[in-house]
């Protein structure tokens, strides 16, 4: 189950890039740098919340950018004088329910889903981690232009982001060490005695700082956009009988009706069909294999919990939902007033945007068992992207 948030500080200037606007708004491969960065986290199965920290005078521009690129469920706050002030403002927006907080530079658009996962899982295991790569080049110490010594690179690492920690540890670090000027969160954590574990970063996960960095980013992101994504498609179907003395739950929503669906769980045909579609897409059988009706553990369970479990399996294979199309076949009751609420619940459970989930209801014009009001059925088709 996703329990992570990411703070993306993007309140810097474009001075070293020789721009008259913040570098994160500069387009690379046809898309602003900050949009590339947000997209890397937006559908990641571990990330439940994104907090974007931007300059005060670019707040409205940032809001318009998110709307233009249909980036939903993102909180925007304005930054402070120092990076750590910006991160602290973002940290104050992290929900109480979140356990793991990642911090990632807005100008590192080439971060991979695999690196995000490594940092998230590393923080779960160790408490605090930092993405880094071993220093490969020979390092020289100098005074002016004169070499005064060679630095032993043994044990030296080049820090990157994401940097991740349990929220409580990060809050402690800011409370006890926040007045000190630092360049990253790891230094804050180290300063209060919290061990920070090195996580293998990536040579391509560069921070765009100088004009020449744009050449690498342009080539990398353009190549990344061009190949066809690995996709998988699944179809699911479920049907349950309508009976007395049962609640009617569809798409996680309780619907007022004198009949409910019979079943071992809450018999939510919509969620069950979607679970089967997801399991089918990843080649993992069906819902009965994973949640058998012979187990008391699933007796009367709210099926959204089953969906969250299935999505965890999907995420472990580094897949995410591209879109899902769901058709409920039901003569009565009328479902139209409840479809938006269903859509919101499903999107939240699947860690995707509301626009990625389409739910529609139809009838069989009083033909067959659904037409006679004996039951409700549902078809679901889902596309997964890696």
From Swiss-Prot:
Site positions (Positions MEP for the nucleophilic attack): 153, 207
Stretches the record annotates as 2-C-methyl-D-erythritol 2,4-cyclodiphosphate synthase: 232-386
GO biological process annotation, one example: terpenoid biosynthetic process
Binding-site residues, a divalent metal cation: 238, 240, 272
Superkingdom, taxonomy of origin: Bacteria
Involved pathway(s): Isoprenoid biosynthesis; isopentenyl diphosphate biosynthesis via DXP pathway; isopentenyl diphosphate from 1-deoxy-D-xylulose 5-phosphate: step 2/6; Isoprenoid biosynthesis; isopentenyl diphosphate biosynthesis via DXP pathway; isopentenyl diphosphate from 1-deoxy-D-xylulose 5-phosphate: step 4/6
GO MF annotation terms: 2-C-methyl-D-erythritol 2,4-cyclodiphosphate synthase activity; 2-C-methyl-D-erythritol 4-phosphate cytidylyltransferase activity; metal ion binding
Catalytic activity from the UniProt record: 2-C-methyl-D-erythritol 4-phosphate + CTP + H(+) = 4-CDP-2-C-methyl-D-erythritol + diphosphate; 4-CDP-2-C-methyl-D-erythritol 2-phosphate = 2-C-methyl-D-erythritol 2,4-cyclic diphosphate + CMP
HAMAP family attached to this UniProt entry: IspD, IspDF, IspF
Family recorded in the similarity comment: In the N-terminal section; belongs to the IspD/TarI cytidylyltransferase family. IspD subfamily.
Function: Bifunctional enzyme that catalyzes the formation of 4-diphosphocytidyl-2-C-methyl-D-erythritol from CTP and 2-C-methyl-D-erythritol 4-phosphate (MEP) (IspD), and catalyzes the conversion of 4-diphosphocytidyl-2-C-methyl-D-erythritol 2-phosphate (CDP-ME2P) to 2-C-methyl-D-erythritol 2,4-cyclodiphosphate (ME-CPP) with a corresponding release of cytidine 5-monophosphate (CMP) (IspF).
Name assigned to this protein: Bifunctional enzyme IspD/IspF
Organism for this UniProt entry: Desulfotalea psychrophila (strain LSv54 / DSM 12343)
Primary gene name: ispDF
């Amino acid at each position: 189950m996703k329990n992570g948030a990411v703070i993306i500080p993007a309140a810097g200037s474009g001075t070293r890039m020789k721009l008259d606007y913040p570098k994160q708004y500069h387009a690379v491969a046809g898309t602003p740098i900050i949009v590339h960065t947000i997209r890397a986290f937006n559908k990641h199965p571990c990330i439940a919340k994104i907090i974007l920290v931007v300059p005060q005078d670019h707040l409205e521009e940032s809001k318009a950018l998110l709307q233009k690129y249909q980036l939903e469920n993102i909180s925007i706050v304005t930054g402070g004088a120092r990076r750590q002030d910006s991160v602290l403002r973002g940290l104050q927006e992290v929900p109480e329910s979140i356990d793991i907080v990642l911090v990632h530079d807005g100008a590192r658009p080439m971060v991979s889903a695999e690196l995000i996962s490594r940092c998230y899982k590393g923080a779960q295991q160790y408490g605090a981690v930092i993405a880094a790569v071993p220093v490969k080049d020979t390092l020289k110490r100098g005074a002016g232009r004169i070499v005064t010594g060679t630095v032993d690179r043994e044990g030296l690492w080049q820090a990157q982001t994401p940097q991740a920690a349990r929220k409580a540890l990060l809050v402690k670090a800011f409370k006890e060490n926040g007045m000190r000027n630092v360049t990253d969160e790891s230094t804050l954590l180290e300063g209060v005695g919290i061990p920070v574990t090195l996580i293998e970063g990536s040579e391509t996960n560069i921070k765009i700082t100088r004009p020449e960095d744009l050449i690498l980013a342009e080539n990398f992101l353009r190549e990344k956009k061009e190949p066809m994504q690995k996709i998988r498609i699944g179809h699911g179907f479920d049907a349950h009988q309508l009976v007395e003395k049962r609640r009617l739950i569809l798409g996680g929503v309780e619907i007022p009706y004198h009949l409910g669906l019979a079943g071992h769980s809450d018999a939510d045909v919509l969620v069950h069909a979607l679970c089967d579609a997801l399991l089918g897409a990843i080649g993992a059988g069906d819902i009965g294999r994973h949640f058998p009706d012979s187990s008391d553990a699933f007796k009367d369970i709210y099926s959204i919990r089953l969906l969250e479990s299935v999505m965890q399996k999907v995420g472990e294979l580094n897949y995410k939902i591209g879109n899902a199309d769901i058709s409920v076949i039901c003569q009565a009751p009328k479902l139209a007033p409840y479809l938006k609420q269903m859509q919101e619940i499903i999107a939240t459970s699947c860690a995707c945007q509301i626009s990625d989930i389409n739910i529609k209801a139809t009838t069989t014009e009083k033909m067959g068992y659904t037409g006679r009001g004996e039951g409700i059925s549902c078809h679901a088709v889902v596309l997964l992207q890696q």
